[in-house]
Amino acid sequence: MSWIDRIFNKDTSSTSSRKANVPEGVWTKCTSCEQVLYRDELRRHLEVCPKCGHHMRIDARERLLALLDKDSSQELSAELEPKDILKFKDLKKYKDRISAAQKETGEKDALISMFGTLYGMPIVAAASNFSFMGGSMGSVVGAKFVQAAEKAIAENCPFVCFSASGGARMQEALFSLMQMAKTSAVLAKMREQGVPFISVLTDPTLGGVSASFAMLGDINIAEPKALIGFAGPRVIEQTVREKLPEGFQRSEFLLEKGAIDMIVKRADMRHTLASVLSKLSNKPSPFVEPELVENEEQSKSDNE
C-alpha cells in the first residue's frame, strides 16, 4: 500500500467512526430549505424550521398537548379502533395496513380528541394524524369527531379541530363516505346550540375531509403554505390540461380568494385561538391583549 492510499484509508475510517458515534434521530433536514437541523431544537419550535419558517407536519398528540394547558388534557374516545368489516384487500389487506399504521404511530386511528383548557377556558380539541394512513377518514375517525362535538355541546364549550388528511379512507368504501354526512350533521347541531367550532386547516387538507367538516368552521384558519382543496393540483392539471396559477390551493391563495378567514403561524396558534374563542363565546379574554398594554403605556407617557 502506498503512502497516499494509507492517508485516504485513514480518513475514511475516522469519518466512519465519527458517524457511528452519532445516535440515530439526532439530526433531521428541513423539507423546504433542506438545512440540517437539530431534532430537539425543531421539536421545541413545534416542527417549524427555525431557519426558513417552513411548517412541517407535526404529530397529532404533540399538537394537542402543545395547545392545551399543561396537565389539563383528558383524551376522549380512546378505546375506539378500526375494524376490517368489508375484508378489503388492495395490494395489502386492510387489517394489515391498520396494524402497520398502529405500530408506526402508536395510535389506534388517524384522529385524536381531548377535553381540556386553553388559558383556563374549557375546550374540546381534535387533531388528525397524517402519519396514520394519510390521516384518512374512516368510521372510527368519524365517530371520534362526532363524540368530540357531542362533548362540546354537553359542556357548552368551543370545539377546535386541526385537519391533516388525504380524504375519505377508500378501504372502507361507503362507510367512509357516510362520515362526511355524519360530521356535517353534528356541526349543524352545534350551530343550532350556539356552540363555536373552529376549523384549523393544516398541510394537507384534501378530499372528503375538505368537502365536509374541515370547511364548516364558524372561523376557518389555516397554517402558512398549507395545501387545501378537494383534488390535488397534479390531478387537476391532468384533468383540465392547463397549468395552474402559482401557489394554487395554498392557504395564501385561498385567503386572497376569501375561502378561509385567516392564516396563523403555529407559534401564534394558542394565543389567536384563545382570542377568537373568547369573542365567539362572548366571554372576557383570558389574558391581556398585547396591543392594549402598548396603548395603555403610550397613554401614560403622553399624559406625562
Curated annotation (Swiss-Prot):
A zinc finger (C4-type) spans 30-52. GO terms for cellular component: acetate CoA-transferase complex. It catalyses: N(6)-carboxybiotinyl-L-lysyl-[protein] + acetyl-CoA = N(6)-biotinyl-L-lysyl-[protein] + malonyl-CoA. PROSITE patterns: COA_CT_NTER. Binds 1 zinc ion per subunit. NCBIfam families: accD. The gene is accD. Pathway: Lipid metabolism; malonyl-CoA biosynthesis; malonyl-CoA from acetyl-CoA: step 1/1. HAMAP family: AcetylCoA_CT_beta. It comes from Pasteurella multocida (strain Pm70). GO terms for molecular function: acetyl-CoA carboxylase activity; ATP binding; carboxyl- or carbamoyltransferase activity; zinc ion binding. Pfam families: Carboxyl_trans (PF01039), Zn_ribbon_ACC (PF17848). SUPFAM superfamilies: ClpP/crotonase. Signal peptide: none annotated. Its EC number is 2.1.3.15. Residues 26-295 form the CoA carboxyltransferase N-terminal domain. Gene3D superfamilies: 2-enoyl-CoA Hydratase, Chain A, domain 1. Acetyl-CoA carboxylase is a heterohexamer composed of biotin carboxyl carrier protein (AccB), biotin carboxylase (AccC) and two subunits each of ACCase subunit alpha (AccA) and ACCase subunit beta (AccD). This is Acetyl-coenzyme A carboxylase carboxyl transferase subunit beta. It is found in: Cytoplasm. Belongs to the AccD/PCCB family. PANTHER family: ACETYL-COENZYME A CARBOXYLASE CARBOXYL TRANSFERASE SUBUNIT BETA, CHLOROPLASTIC (PTHR42995:SF5).
